[in-house]
A protein has these predicted regions:
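Intrinsically disordered, low-complexity polar/charged tails and linkers
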Residues: 1-25, 35
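Small-residue-enriched alpha-helical segments and adjacent helix-cap loops
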Residues: 2-4, 26-177, 202-203, 316-323
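Generic secondary-structure signature for well-ordered alpha-helical cores
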Residues: 47-54, 87, 126-130, 186-190, ...
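Flexible, glycine/charged-enriched surface loops at secondary-structure junctions
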Residues: 54-61, 92-93, 131-137, 266-280, ...
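A glycine-rich phosphate-binding loop feature that marks nucleotide/adenosyl-phosphate handling sites
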Residues: 139-146, 275-286
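Iron-sulfur cluster-binding cysteine motifs and their immediate structural context
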Residues: 177-199, 209-225
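A hydrophobic, small-residue-rich beta->alpha segment in the mid-to-C-terminal subdomain
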Residues: 234-269
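C-terminal, charged low-complexity interaction regions
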Residues: 287-323
Length: 323
């Protein structure tokens, strides 16, 4: 049995080097900026798996790769080769976790380049805020459309693409076979009393399929952006993320992520998931604070917070990378 202290185990786990249940070997978790690895990086993965592990690799839910069966003495040389390939080990702890994205970049349903946006979030918050300790893990997911393949609503902060349609009834000719009715995947389009097309806006998911369907262009795109859901939890207990309402640009989403993290650090109790913090504060009140810029005026103080009697964070003087 490997003889290392609990403090050493914790420190290694914080670097994505996790002791197995055999008490002897580790897995090494390798993180890509957006879940996408180049062929050169994949070759490196297979090489280090053979050289330093037992030759096996496993894929995780958050699109990271884990090298299996790594002896303790092989951990440091493995990490050096991973870093030389432009990747890092990690993805554990009470920090921003690896960012996941669906394949919206290449998917026929994708409304955005999700992998590029995930890379932007990764650089800013996984890398830049890596030393900012939070009450618990903080997971971010980027979805390209309302299909929600990457499950944004089960992440602490999730976004998914929106193409908001606008209807021009003057262009509608009451076609016997309406392409929009046939194309709508959620069946929120029907004929009204006068034969005109009626959209149930409450049921519409803003997938944008109707916009290209009508040959008379009776539907156009009014707005394109991201819906935002916060506080999703999937684990021992579950909580579906709360939609904060509205459609946001990438820049606006980046600012919302920053404010969400700051509010979580300020209001969360140690060991409390983000969704539980939201519920304790009150959903409406939390969303009000999130949409306001008030928390940004307290940013410096929040990043200096230590643990408090009510809970709070556990790191003093958190630093944000300028890189």
């Amino acid at each position: 049995m490997l003889k290392i202290t609990e403090a050493e185990k914790k420190a290694l786990k914080g670097r994505g080097l996790i002791l197995n249940n055999d008490g002897e070997h580790f897995i090494a978790r390798i993180v890509a900026p957006n879940g996408v690895f180049t062929n050169e990086q994949m070759q490196m993965v297979t090489d280090v798996a053979k050289k330093y592990g037992d030759g096996r690799v496993a894929l995780t839910v958050r699109l990271t790769i884990e090298i299996q069966g790594v002896p303790y003495e092989n951990l440091e040389p493995l990490v050096k080769e991973v870093e030389a390939a432009g990747l890092v080990t990690g993805g554990t702890g009470s920090i921003v976790r690896p960012v996941v994205a669906c394949k919206g970049t290449v998917c026929v349903h994708g409304l955005f380049d999700t992998q590029a946006f995930a890379k932007r979030i990764y650089d800013e918050f996984f890398v830049g805020w890596h030393e900012v300790t939070l009450p618990h893990k903080f997971k971010i997911a980027v979805g390209g459309c309302p299909n929600n393949c990457v499950k944004p609503g089960l992440n602490d902060f999730g976004v998914y693409g929106q193409s908001v349609p606008e209807q021009d009834l003057n262009r509608c000719r009451n076609c016997v076979k309406c392409a929009v009715i046939e194309r709508c995947p959620v069946h929120c389009v029907s004929r009204g009393a006068a034969g005109k097309i009626v959209v149930d806006k409450a049921a519409c998911t803003n997938c944008g399929k109707c916009i290209a369907a009508c040959p008379l262009h009776s539907f156009s795109e009014k707005e394109r952006g991201y819906a935002v859901v916060i506080g999703g939890i999937w684990g021992k207990t579950q909580r579906l993320g709360t939609n904060i309402g509205g459609v946001y640009s990438e820049d606006e989403v980046m600012k919302l992520i920053e404010k969400a993290i700051l509010l979580y650090r300020e209001l969360g109790r140690t060991g409390e998931r983000f969704g539980r913090t939201i519920d304790r504060v009150g959903v409406e009140e939390f969303i009000r604070q999130l949409k306001s810029d008030e928390v940004l005026s307290r940013k410096g103080d929040i990043l200096k917070m230590a643990a408090t009697a009510k809970g709070g964070v556990i790191t003093v003087n958190a630093q944000i990378s300028s890189s």
